[in-house]
Curated annotation (Swiss-Prot):
This is Homoserine O-succinyltransferase. Belongs to the MetA family. It comes from Pseudoalteromonas translucida (strain TAC 125). The gene is metAS. One of its GO terms (molecular function) is homoserine O-succinyltransferase activity. Transfers a succinyl group from succinyl-CoA to L-homoserine, forming succinyl-L-homoserine.
Amino acid sequence: MPITVKDELPAIARLRQENVFVMPQTRAKTQEIRPMRLAILNLMPNKVETEVQFIRLLANSPLQVNVELLRLDTHRSSSNSEQHLDTFYRYFSEVKNNNYDALIVTGAPLAHLEYQDVAYWDEFTAILDWAEQHVTSTLFSCWAAHAALYHHYKIKRDLKTDKLCGVFTHQCYFEHGALTRGFDDTFLVPHSRYGHVDVNKINACNELVVLAGSEKVGAYLVKNKSGSQVFITGHPEYDADSLKAEYQRDCEKSDNAPKPENYFPDDDATKQPSKTWQSHAFLLFSNWLNYYVYQTTPYDINLVSQDVRTNNYAE
């Protein structure tokens, strides 16, 4: 949240050099506040589990966030109750004329499919294009991050033979970046994917900035210059046992299922893993909501489609 101080305080200049948001009293007196309107396009098979994981992170913010759950018109989930979806979800066609302060697009278990072979690819890309005009900031998770990088910037992923699976150390590349505010120099995040995007391809795009990653996982946290698009290639939202459940499922399908790296205590799959990435996850989502949603979106949500932004955090 912003700090309000007297306009003439000398410390303001130094704090702003560090990209710390300090609000002058003159602005604070005229500031208008309303609940944030956020939509989650949930593409994961287990809807309820994914709802819990993302809403948990959103709830850690002091902001009031009104969450709407979205579903695709062109895809029917076979692993979820239609009653649950009918009760709690809205079709995209029902909300396409709305504006939102924020949108989260979850991952999807589509690792081995070419994008154009995804049954709902046309609707998915239509939503991505819609978001550019109707959403202040969109956060893409895992598969959705790779797919959005391809759709918006023509950056292709590579499909690896070996699955990247485990909890890995990452480096923060922008100490004073708004999205990375308060990050440790190194931090842990789970990954579970076959797709990989070459960091050099992202760095070659002048519209994108790689904020965090590692040699092992490549780019983890990427955003466009304005912060209207944020791409996360890992799973900071995962529960402590999410990778364990995936591993057990994979073991039922194959005798050569890769064991998650740096995850099980003593590398023993019978032991309960710890959640070593929770503080990072809370901080990441808090920063995103604060700096790229709350501090950026117009008070009149109807102005979102006119790209009226009150701040521009460009690292």
